[in-house]
From Swiss-Prot:
This is Sulfate/thiosulfate import ATP-binding protein CysA. NCBIfam families: 3a0106s01 (TIGR00968). Residues 5-235 form the ABC transporter domain. Pfam families: ABC_tran, TOBE_3. ATP binds at residues 37-44. Keywords: Acetylation, ATP-binding, Cell membrane, Membrane, Nucleotide-binding, Sulfate transport, Translocase, Transport. The lineage of its organism: Bacteria, Bacillati, Actinomycetota, Actinomycetes, Mycobacteriales. One of its GO terms (cellular component) is ATP-binding cassette (ABC) transporter complex. It is found in: Cell membrane. It is an enzyme of class 7 (translocase). Its EC number is 7.3.2.3. It comes from Mycobacterium tuberculosis (strain ATCC 25618 / H37Rv). The gene is cysA. The modification N-acetylthreonine is found at residue 2. The keyword Cell wall biogenesis/degradation does not apply. It catalyses: sulfate(out) + ATP + H2O = sulfate(in) + ADP + phosphate + H(+); thiosulfate(out) + ATP + H2O = thiosulfate(in) + ADP + phosphate + H(+).
Length: 351
C-alpha cells in the first residue's frame, strides 16, 4: 500500500493546550479518510497542519514522498474546502471554478474544457452563469469543491464542508461526495464531528481525542471492534449491562427470562438475562427507544427495538421486562478506558 500523506510524530501546542500529541498518521493513496472527534480533539489542527496553514512544533509532513513540513500551502499541491465556503461574490459560478486555472495562466481552451467537465461532475452545468448569492448552500459547497478540484490537487482537504447546512442537505451531499470521490479518485481527508457522516462516506476513519489518535480503521472496524470505551461511545449511543458496553440496538427486550440468543459473530459475548422496569417508550419512526431501569441496581439504560417488536410486546411504563445483549463488542481498553466525566459526556448509561 502506498501513502499519499504521512504525518510523523507531529506535536502542536497553543500555550498549555496540547492540540496534537505526537501524532503518527498515514492516508492511503486514493482513499477518503475521515478525521472524527469532538471539539478540541485536534482533528482540524491536524488537517491545517497537513495543509500548511499551521506549522507543527515537532514532526514532519510528507505528501506523495515530498517533505512539505516547511513548504507554504500554495506549493503543497492541495485543494482545501472550508465549512464556510469562500466565493468571489462578483464572479459567476464558471469564473469562480476557473479562478485557480486563470491564476496559473492555463490556455483558454483548457480552462473551458476543464470547467465544463467539473460543472457537469458536481451537477452545476445549468448554473454556470449564476452568482454565488443565487445558489443554495449545498450548491455553493459543490462550487467550492469544483474550484478546489480544478487545479488537479494531489490531495483534497475538507474541513467540515457541510457543517453549516441543514440535516437533510448534509445527508444528500455526503452521498454525493462519496459518488464524486469514486469518480475522481483524489486522495481526500475529511474533518467531521458527525459520526453518521464519517461512517457513511469514508473508506477509513481516524478517531481523535485530546490530541491523540485513538483508532484508525474501516468504518466497520471502528464500529464493531472499537479500540476502547471512548471510541465506542463516540461512535454512537451506549448502555452498560453487567459491566459490558453494548449498543442500545443490540439489546433484546422480552416478557420472559427465556431469552437464548445466538451470537452475531465470533466476537459476540453475553451479558446474561437481566430484569428491568420500563420507564418510558418513545416512538422514533420505524424504531422505538425503550428507557429502562435495572431491577437489581437501579441504574438507567436504553434499548432500541423495532416498531414491530415494540407493538408485539405492548410495552407500557412500569412493566417488568427481561433484557439481554445480542452482541458485546470486544474493547481493548475495557470499560475503565473512560473516566466518570467521560462517561457523562458521551452519554454512557449503566445498570
Amino acid at each position: 500500500m502506498t501513502y499519499a500523506i504521512v504525518v510523523a510524530d507531529a506535536t502542536k501546542r497553543y500555550g498549555d493546550f496540547v492540540a496534537l500529541d505526537h501524532v503518527d498518521f498515514v492516508v492511503p493513496t486514493g482513499s477518503l479518510t475521515a478525521l472524527l472527534g469532538p471539539s478540541g480533539s485536534g482533528k482540524s489542527t491536524l488537517l491545517r497542519t497537513i495543509a500548511g496553514l499551521d506549522q507543527p512544533d515537532t514532526g514532519t509532513i510528507t505528501i506523495n514522498g515530498r517533505d512539505v513540513t516547511r513548504v507554504p500551502p500554495q506549493r503543497r499541491g492541495i485543494g482545501f474546502v472550508f465549512q464556510h465556503y469562500a466565493a468571489f461574490k462578483h464572479l459567476t459560478v464558471r469564473d469562480n471554478v476557473a479562478f485557480g486555472l486563470k491564476i496559473r495562466k492555463r490556455p483558454k481552451a483548457e480552462i473551458k474544457a476543464k470547467v465544463d467537465n467539473l460543472l457537469q461532475v458536481v451537477g452545476l452545468s445549468g448554473f454556470q452563469s449564476r452568482y454565488p448569492n443565487q445558489l443554495s448552500g449545498g450548491q455553493r459547497q459543490r462550487m467550492a469543491l469544483a474550484r478546489a478540484l480544478a487545479v488537479d490537487p494531489e490531495v483534497l482537504l475538507l474541513d467540515e464542508p457541510f457543517g453549516a447546512l441543514d440535516a437533510k442537505v448534509r445527508e444528500e451531499l455526503r452521498a454525493w461526495l462519496r459518488r464524486l470521490h469514486d469518480e475522481v479518485h483524489v486522495t481526500t481527508v475529511l474533518v467531521t464531528h458527525d459520526q453518521a457522516e464519517a461512517l457513511d462516506v469514508a473508506d477509513r476513519i481516524a478517531v481523535l481525542h485530546k490530541g491523540r489518535i485513538e483508532q484508525v480503521g474501516s468504518p466497520t472496524d471502528v464500529y464493531d471492534a472499537p479500540a476502547n470505551a471512548f471510541v465506542m461511545s463516540f461512535l454512537g449511543a451506549v448502555s452498560t449491562l453487567n459491566g459490558s458496553l453494548v449498543r442500545p440496538h443490540d439489546i433484546r427486550v422480552g416478557r420472559t427470562p427465556n431469552m437464548a440468543v445466538a451470537a452475531a459473530d465470533g466476537t459476540a459475548g453475553s451479558t446474561g438475562v437481566l430484569r428491568a422496569v420500563v420507564d418510558r417508550v418513545v416512538v422514533l419512526g420505524f424504531e422505538v427507544r425503550v428507557e429502562l431501569t435495572s431491577a437489581a441496581t437501579g441504574g438507567a439504560f436504553t434499548a432500541q427495538i423495532t416498531r414491530g417488536d415494540a407493538e408485539a410486546l405492548a410495552l407500557r411504563e412500569g412493566d417488568t421486562v427481561y433484557v439481554r445483549a445480542t452482541r458485546v463488542p470486544p474493547i481493548a481498553g475495557g470499560v475503565s478506558g473512560v473516566d466518570d466525566a467521560g462517561v457523562e459526556r458521551v452519554k454512557v448509561t449503566s445498570t
